[in-house]
Amino acid sequence: MLDSKDSQIAQQLKSRLSQITQIEQLVIFGSRARGNADRESDMDVFIEVPTLTPHLRRSISEIAWEIGLENDLLIFTLVATPGDIRNGLLGANPILRAIEKEGVAI
């Protein structure tokens, strides 16, 4: 479960990203989603977008970095398209299982 500050940061990230692309899903996972994060924990974010170019991937990383810097937080982004997931490009990645099991959709 996200605390209110994490929820606010996630909403801010989604809002900023929505200005540059359509967001199919934005899911927080990892220690912040489980509720056992400490001051040093990063925020793990899965972002699903319709299409992904190198430019868009870079822009998403830059926005996450800016918001993280404003909030003294490292934001790790995992960005994929529906095709990446459907075609198994992410494979049997344990991160996908964690996202499904503990993820908090924003």
Regions found by a protein language model. Give the residues of each.
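Glycine-rich beta-strand-to-loop/alpha-helix junction loops that act as flexible
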Residues: 29-31
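Short beta-strand->loop micro-motif that forms the acidic, two-metal-ion catalytic signature
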Residues: 43-47
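Catalytic core of pol beta-like nucleotidyltransferases
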Residues: 1-24, 33-35, 39, 49-106
